[in-house]
UniProtKB/Swiss-Prot annotation:
Cellular component annotations (GO), alphabetically ordered: cytosol
Name under which the protein is recorded: UPF0434 protein BRADO0313
Superkingdom of this protein's organism: Bacteria
HAMAP family found in the cross-reference section: UPF0434
Organism: Bradyrhizobium sp. (strain ORS 278)
Protein family (similarity comment): Belongs to the UPF0434 family.
InterPro entries found in the cross-reference section: Trm112-like (IPR005651)
Length: 65
């Protein structure tokens, strides 16, 4: 039997990234692995990822240019 694939502790499940959208615009998100953020270009917000869990609250998001 094959062992489940282990992901690094700070990574996000790729399947989750496929279904998540910006809660403000319902638009697509871009994953920034270096900063551990999900970027919404349309809302100009960066949602943090903490311990591999995306924090999809607009009040927790960082404004971007």
């Amino acid at each position: 039997m094959n062992a489940p694939l282990e992901r690094p502790a700070n990574s996000v499940d790729p399947k989750l990234l496929e279904i998540l959208v910006c809660p403000m615009t319902k638009g697509p998100l871009e994953y920034d692995a270096a900063r551990q953020e999900l970027i919404s270009r349309s809302a100009k917000l960066a949602y943090p990822i903490r311990d591999g869990i995306p924090i999809m609250l607009p009040e927790e998001a960082r404004k971007i240019d």
